[in-house]
Curated annotation (Swiss-Prot):
Keyword Hydrolase attributed: no
Region of interest called Transactivation domain B (Gln-rich), as start-end residue ranges on this chain: 263-497
Subunit structure: Interacts with ATF7IP, ATF7IP2, BAHD1, POGZ, HCFC1, AATF and PHC2. Interacts with SV40 VP2/3 proteins. Interacts with SV40 major capsid protein VP1; this interaction leads to a cooperativity between the 2 proteins in DNA binding. Interacts with HLTF; the interaction may be required for basal transcriptional activity of HLTF. Interacts (deacetylated form) with EP300; the interaction enhances gene expression. Interacts with HDAC1 and JUN. Interacts with ELF1; the interaction is inhibited by glycosylation of SP1. Interaction with NFYA; the interaction is inhibited by glycosylation of SP1. (Microbial infection) Interacts with murine minute virus NS1; this interaction allows high levels of viral P38 promoter transactivation by NS1.
Swiss-Prot/TrEMBL GO biological process terms: definitive hemopoiesis; embryonic camera-type eye morphogenesis; embryonic placenta development; embryonic process involved in female pregnancy; embryonic skeletal system development; enucleate erythrocyte differentiation; gene expression; in utero embryonic development
Region Transactivation domain A (Gln-rich), residue ranges: 148-253
Subcellular compartments: Nucleus; Cytoplasm
Annotated positions of the N6-acetyllysine modification: 704
Residue ranges, annotated region (Repressor domain): 2-84
Bias type Low complexity, positions: 37-49, 74-87, 126-138, 344-357, 373-398
Region (Domain D): 709-784
Classification via SUPFAM superfamilies: beta-beta-alpha zinc fingers
ZnF (C2H2-type) intervals: 627-656, 657-686, 687-714
Name by which UniProt lists this protein: Transcription factor Sp1
Length: 784
């Protein structure tokens, strides 16, 4: 046994580094907390082995140990896999410290190898596979070429250790060295080291050597609302209140739309010229475009409908960024070779607001530039004035103000536009509350365009024309309605002049007039040349009824008198005025004068018979004159000129007589057709059958009905002349019909009536006369 003891003394002493991966020694998972111990084989033969369990009394021979050592060197993986115990799941490695250096850093241990290469040794404990009854421990040294474990820590990542693998050492280690950082909107931030060296070896592992000065690089792939910590960029919405008299220069345009309420929702939008200001309606929401930084980014920052303050900002610098708070509007104006005028107003719910940001904006280029200065007022109003700076350019273009009102709900502030006749093209806007608004004055500038009102007028020849009126110094009281209506009153005067534009004198304001009504004084209009006055009260005494027809404000219809003249004014695109006479001859619509209570003179007929004097038969003065249609291929002959004119209207397709019944609006060529159509609305049946109680609306229907009675009854041929009186004919005390009732007398020829029928008619009170020779006589009240 002494020889064996001496042979065991020759075993080389090694430094054993036991790495307890499972946590037996309390070390870290990466190899921290290694225990160093120097062991030596003794003759006692009693040693502790984690794989074998207890000591053995008999020792193997040196030849057996040599054979076991050689087998371990040749197939280390096989022996390691077959004989590894349950307590060595993490493995125990021994590194040779003869050629390595160990240094301790702030976050762990670091083993630095020399340039000549390291030869780490590994000692694995297992039982002897050849000797099943023995659990002895064998310790041998083996050399693993090209590879070591390095425990390193990055200097800039807190408590994050980087485990890098060198060539030849377990290339299947998975680890994560860069933590994931996300912003509030869910986008990941990428870290890139300045001057970092990234190396990749043959086994697929990437070694990152980080440097100093880590920077955060935001992801620029998507254009979300990312607020990056970049220089020259504001981090929050800042109201611009410190630009008292600062002058901003540049050429970038910033245009916005601000709702301004003027009897509706009216927005003053910028126009392309200094000499024009257009008022157009828009929605309540305002769009604000703000310039970005050098990154050319824009960000709308206004929201909400309640406005607490109004700010006026003008900027032309492309490298500046402006923001407003969430309760204010930001309006920007630019003057780049043109004049742009913006009006802003401030308003709140029910009360008037006060301007908060007195500012002045300059940066003027060109002769048409503007200088807008916004001052703070004390009465809860915001005034902005613009003045012309630089050289006064010669402006020949007139200014025209167009107002298109819309309805506004809520306590929005109203905008009163006062254009005073001042020099220098100065406008003053004042935003006042709706509760304190009593009257609105709209005054035109001296060199501004006219306020035009187009009214339909009637010429001396009966033509309807549109007359343009130019109003100056107009004052409207209580502008509460959406439209301005010219309402005719009792003493209204209709003016007709030859000139297209007429300048009116200043109109005095009425004390109390309805909302939205402009009163036109007849005394002022009477001073104009060519005026004709129609007294509506005198029309009723003369027997003329006034009706309201759609399309024109006035229609004059004569009551059934001598000839039943009816005059209708129809505004059908400047068409002539058409009249229809029931029994008169020679009336022409071209010479009708709208005079009160006076008939128009008759005009000679222009038909071919009248021109050639062939209408009246030669030598027979008692025969009536006839009128023939001049249309080629027609040749119809009429006894009255009114009938001929109605026939000519049928040729031309003209229908001047329109039904004024509600929701009807049908038009007819002749007046009797209109009267017959009106009976369909009223249900009146004025034609009664003499033999039965049936009644009819039309006389031709009655004639057809009487023929049915004649066919049923046979007898001697007897012709009767029966005069019927309508039910609605109001007979006077003397038996004469009043002028208000239209008396229609129908001569009905009755043939082959039996004597019983004649006796029945006589008993009913109808005058029955027996005539021997019957002549066709038409004395119908409608004249046709």
């Amino acid at each position: 046994m002494s020889d064996q003891d001496h042979s065991m003394d020759e075993v080389t002493a090694v430094v054993k580094i036991e790495k307890d991966v499972g946590g037996n020694n309390g070390g870290s998972g990466n190899g921290g907390g290694a225990a160093f111990s120097q062991t030596r084989s003794s003759s006692t033969g009693s040693s502790s082995s984690s794989g074998g369990g207890g000591g053995q009394e008999s020792q193997p021979s040196p030849l057996a140990l040599l054979a076991a050592t050689c087998s371990r060197i040749e197939s280390p993986n096989e022996n390691s896999n077959n004989s590894q115990g349950p307590s060595q799941s993490g493995g125990t490695g021994e590194l040779d410290l003869t050629a390595t250096q160990l240094s301790q850093g702030a976050n762990g241990w670091q083993i630095i190898s020399s340039s000549s290469g390291a030869t780490p040794t590994s000692k694995e404990q297992s039982g002897n596979s050849t000797n099943g009854s023995n659990g002895s421990e064998s310790s041998k040294n083996r050399t693993v070429s090209g590879g070591q474990y390095v425990v390193a820590a990055t200097p800039n990542l807190q408590n994050q250790q980087v485990l890098t693998g060198l060539p030849g050492v377990m290339p299947n280690i998975q680890y994560q060295v860069i933590p994931q950082f996300q912003t509030v909107d869910g986008q990941q931030l990428q870290f890139a080291a300045t001057g970092a060296q990234v190396q990749q070896d043959g086994s697929g592992q990437i070694q990152i050597i980080p440097g100093a000065n880590q920077q955060i690089i935001p992801n620029r792939g998507s254009g979300g609302n990312i607020i990056a910590a970049m220089p020259n960029l504001l981090q929050q919405a800042v109201p611009l209140q410190g630009l008292a008299n600062n002058v901003l220069s540049g050429q970038t345009q910033y245009v916005t739309n601000v709702p301004v309420a003027l009897n509706g929702n009216i927005t003053l939008l910028p126009v392309n010229s200094v000499s024009a200001a257009t008022l157009t309606p828009s929605s309540q929401a305002g769009t604000i475009s703000s310039s970005g930084s050098q990154e050319s980014s824009s960000q709308p920052v206004t929201s909400g409908t309640a406005i607490s303050s109004a700010s006026l900002v003008s900027s032309q610098a492309s490298s500046s960024s402006f923001f407003t708070n969430a309760n204010s509007y930001s309006t920007t104006t630019t003057t780049s070779n043109m004049g742009i005028m913006n009006f802003t107003s401030s308003g709140s719910s029910g009360t008037s607001s006060q301007g908060q940001t007195p500012q002045r904006v300059g940066g003027l280029q060109g002769s048409d530039s503007l200088n807008i200065q916004q001052n703070q007022t004390s009465g809860g109003s915001l005034q902005g004035s613009q003045q012309k700076e630089g050289e006064q350019s010669q402006q020949t273009q007139q200014q025209q103000i167009l107002i298109q009102p819309q309805l506004v709900q809520g306590g929005q502030a109203l905008q009163a536009l006062q254009a005073a006749p001042l020099s220098g093209q100065t406008f003053t806007t004042q935003a006042i509350s709706q509760e304190t608004l009593q009257n609105l004055q709209l005054q035109a500038v001296q060199n501004s365009g006219p306020i035009i009102i187009r009214t339909p007028t009637v010429g001396p020849n009966g033509q309807v024309s549109w007359q343009t009126l130019q109003l100056q110094n107009l004052q409207v009281q209580n502008p509460q309605a959406q439209t301005i209506t010219l309402a005719p009153m009792q003493g209204v005067s209709l003016g007709q002049t030859s000139s297209s534009n007429t300048t009116l004198t200043p109109i005095a304001s009425a004390a109390s007039i309805p909302a939205g009504t402009v009163t036109v004084n007849a005394a002022q209009l009477s001073s104009m040349p060519g005026l004709q006055t129609i007294n509506l009260s005198a029309l009723g005494t003369s027997g003329i009824q006034v009706h309201q027809l759609p399309g024109l404000p006035l229609a004059i219809a004569n009551t059934p008198g001598d000839h039943g003249t009816q005059l209708g004014l129809h505004g059908s695109g400047g068409d002539g005025i058409h009249d229809e006479t029931a029994g008169g001859e020679g009336e022409n619509s071209s010479d009708l004068q709208p005079q009160a209570g006076r008939r128009t003179r008759r005009e000679a007929c222009t038909c071919p018979y009248c021109k050639d004097s062939e209408g009246r038969a030669s030598g027979d003065p008692g025969k009536k004159k006839q009128h023939i249609c001049h249309i080629q291929g027609c040749g119809k002959v009429y006894g009255k000129t009114s009938h001929l004119r109605a026939h000519l209207r049928w040729h031309t397709g003209e229908r001047p007589f329109m039904c004024n019944w509600s929701y009807c609006g049908k038009r007819f060529t002749r007046s009797d057709e209109l009267q017959r159509h009106k009976r369909t609305h009223t249900g009146e049946k004025k034609f009664a059958c003499p033999e039965c109680p049936k009644r009819f609306m039309r006389s031709d229907h009655l004639s057809k009905h009487i023929k049915t009675h004649q066919n049923k009854k046979g007898g001697p041929g007897v012709a009767l002349s029966v005069g019927t009186l309508p039910l609605d004919s109001g007979a006077g005390s003397e038996g004469t019909a009043t002028p208000s009732a239209l008396i229609t007398t129908n001569m009905v020829a009755m043939e082959a009536i039996c004597p019983e029928g004649i006796a029945r008619l006589a008993n009913s009170g109808i005058n029955v006369m027996q005539v021997t020779e019957l002549q066709s006589i038409n004395i119908s009240g409608n004249g046709f």
